[in-house]
C-alpha cells in the first residue's frame, strides 16, 4: 500500500515523466450517465430515455478492453465515475478486472449505495481511494438537492469505509441548494476524520443542457466567492489567510493548482497531455467538462485515439487576456471554464472574472476585519 503522504509527490513525478514520453498516466472512466440521485447541477446525469436516444453504455467487456489497451500504453491510475457507478450491476466485473491489471483504481460515488454486499466487496478488494460527494449537512438539504433523504445513510457509509481502512475523501460542491450547510458539512468532515475538498465554482452543464453555454444551477459570482472565502477562513491558519489576502491585494497570488494558464499558451493541466476522460458512450475527451475535442478508441484503437487527442489538445489556445491577467492566480480559469462559459476555448469567461474580483475583495475585507477584532 502506498503511503498517503508520498502519493501526491509520486503522482506528480509519474505525470511529469508521462508528459515527456507522451503517455496517458491517468484515465477517467465514466461508466454510466445513470444515477439514483437527481442533482440539478450535474454535468452528466441523463434519464434512461435520453441515454437510449443518444446511444448506449459501453459493456463491461468494452470497458475492460479499453483499460487494457490504455494500461499497455502507460496508464497507471484509473478513476471509475459516473453518474453513480454502483448502479451498474456489472460494476465489480469491471473493477476487479482493472485491479487484476495492476492499475491503481479509485472510485467516485455519491456514497448512498456503499453498504451491505457492495461494502463487503470493497473491503475484500480495496480501491486506491473512494471519493464521496457530500451534498449537504442534513436529510432536508439532500431531499431538496438530490431528491432523497440520503444524508444519514451516506455519513454511515463513509464511517464504515473509514473503519475498514479504506482511504476516503469528501468532495463538496456548493450551490444555491446547500450554501447554508457549508459549516455543518465542515463539522461533519471533522467528526468523520476525512479530508474534504470544497468548490463553489460550478461549470455550466453543457453536455446535458443542449449546449447552453454560461448557464447553470449555481450561485452568483459574488455568492460563489463568499462561499470560497468562508471555506478559506474555516480551513486556513490565521497567518496563512492573512498572507493570502495580502498577496491578493497586491495581485501576486501564486498557488499550486492542477489547472493553470499562461499568456497565449494552451492547456496548462494534465487533460489531453497525460490524462483522458472516457464518456459512458465511448468518446474520449481531454476532460469530462469539455464537449470536444473527441476521439473514438472503440473504432480507432486506443493508441491512435490517444495520439490524436494529444495533438488536438495541443492546438487549444486560451485567452491571452487571461494569461496576462495579474489576478489569474486567484481565478478558476482553465480550458474547460472557457469552453463551458463561452462556447470557445479563447473566449473570456466573464463569470469567472466576476467571481475572482469578488473573491479578492471579500478576502481582503475579511482579513482586515479579523485584524481589527484581534486588536480590540
Region locations from a protein language model:
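Short glycine-enriched, charge-decorated loop/helix-capping segments at active-site entrances
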Residues: 48-57, 143-150, 340
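Conserved alpha-helical substructure of the radical SAM core
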Residues: 1-129
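Radical SAM enzyme [4Fe-4S]-AdoMet core and its adjacent flexible, acidic
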Residues: 124-271, 277-285, 289, 293
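Flexible mid-to-C-terminal extensions adjoining Fe-S/redox cofactors in radical SAM and related proteins
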Residues: 4-13, 18, 23, 45, ...
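Residue-level signal for the nucleotide or nucleotide-sugar donor/cofactor binding architecture
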Residues: 58, 89, 149, 177-180, ...
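Generic short beta-strand
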Residues: 103, 275-276
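Short coil/loop residues immediately preceding or within conserved phosphate-binding loops
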Residues: 26, 272-273
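Short loop/turn motifs at secondary-structure junctions
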Residues: 38, 74, 126, 166-167, ...
